[in-house]
Curated annotation (Swiss-Prot):
Coiled coil spans: none
GO molecular function: single-stranded DNA binding
Source organism of the structure: Shewanella pealeana (strain ATCC 700345 / ANG-SQ1)
Similarity annotation: Belongs to the PriB family.
Gene Ontology biological-process entries: DNA replication, synthesis of primer
GO CC field: primosome complex
Xref: InterPro entries: NA-bd_OB-fold, Primosome_PriB/ssb, Prisomal_replication_PriB
Classification via SUPFAM superfamilies: Nucleic acid-binding proteins
Entry-linked Pfam families: SSB_1 (PF22657)
Quaternary structure and partners: Homodimer. Interacts with PriA and DnaT. Component of the replication restart primosome. Primosome assembly occurs via a 'hand-off' mechanism. PriA binds to replication forks, subsequently PriB then DnaT bind; DnaT then displaces ssDNA to generate the helicase loading substrate.
Gene giving rise to this polypeptide: priB
Name assigned to this protein: Replication restart protein PriB
Stated role: Involved in the restart of stalled replication forks, which reloads the replicative helicase on sites other than the origin of replication; the PriA-PriB pathway is the major replication restart pathway. During primosome assembly it facilitates complex formation between PriA and DnaT on DNA; stabilizes PriA on DNA. Stimulates the DNA unwinding activity of PriA helicase.
């Protein structure tokens, strides 16, 4: 197995919850990250948005708190997801979520 682990903190910009046809609870949030990092000795602004998917009963307790404006830190793995129109995007599948606010 190869390493696939990402830790990212940011602010939720939108959130939705639904159950799959198999009855699995899912919460999907858009996470916006802003920071500054040094690269090659220069300080640069860093910005990204990524969709985060929380699946299963273990997230039921925290899912109700995941609304726009809430700051979280997520640890999980990234996976390629293809939309209905054929667009590819990276999605972060959460394995651990921590509320920061």
């Amino acid at each position: 197995m190869t390493t696939n682990n990402l830790v990212l903190a940011g602010t939720i910009t939108r959130s939705r919850q639904f159950d799959s046809p198999a009855g699995i609870a899912h919460t999907v949030v858009m996470l916006e990250h802003k920071s500054q990092r040094y690269e090659a000795g220069m300080l640069r602004n860093v910005y990204c948005q990524i969709q985060v998917v929380l699946s299963g009963e273990r997230f039921n307790g925290v899912a109700k708190n995941l609304t726009a404006g809430v700051e979280i830190q997520v640890e999980g793995f990234i996976n390629l997801q293809q939309s209905r129109n054929g667009q590819n995007r990276l999605v972060l599948h959460a394995e651990n979520v921590e509320l920061k606010t």
